[in-house]
Amino acid sequence: MQLKALLEPLVTRMGYQLWGMEFRVAKHSALLRLFIDSEQGITLDDCTEVSRQVSALMDVEDPIQVPYTLEVSSPGVDRPLFEAGQYARYVGEQVRVRTQWPIDGQRNFAGAIVSADEDSVTLDVDGREVRLPLEAIARGRLKGTLPPATQVEE
């Protein structure tokens, strides 16, 4: 069973969206990172509770055969993008994308999302449109911007 198919129903039942997941294997260990989201935002307590529930399920199902660390967090301001619908949700926003292989001689792209469908994402990179097949995208991330700090008058 795929990890997403195992974990997404649990996270959804808890009232959260499984925004995405990363699984990285190093020489002697692995890291499973889950990104959760909700309309109300995510707190540290939310992450802790999801971590507890996911850990219990993983102990029973045992889908990972190497020692691993589980991390649960919110996607944050510069949230990673995993699926076509996530790119479509942020049309007009600035992103950074790295591809698995060169496209037009490069692998790193930064620009605004023009459009996204189930097959590709189109970016405006310095005034030219670049179409990136979803299967080519290794990593995509919003270029997050924080709102300006409000000044407190004394």
Curated annotation (Swiss-Prot):
Superkingdom of source: Bacteria
Subcellular localization(s) per the UniProt record: Cytoplasm
GO biological process, one term: ribosomal small subunit assembly
InterPro entries named among the record's database cross-references: Ribosome_maturation_RimP, RimP_C, RimP_C_sf, RimP_N, RimP_N_sf
A Pfam cross-reference name: RimP_N
Recorded GO CC terms: cytosol
Keyword terms, alphabetized: Cytoplasm, Ribosome biogenesis
Primary residence: cytoplasm
Keyword Cytoplasm applies: yes
Family designation: Belongs to the RimP family.
Function recorded in the entry: Required for maturation of 30S ribosomal subunits.
Protein name as annotated: Ribosome maturation factor RimP
Organism: Thioalkalivibrio sulfidiphilus (strain HL-EbGR7)
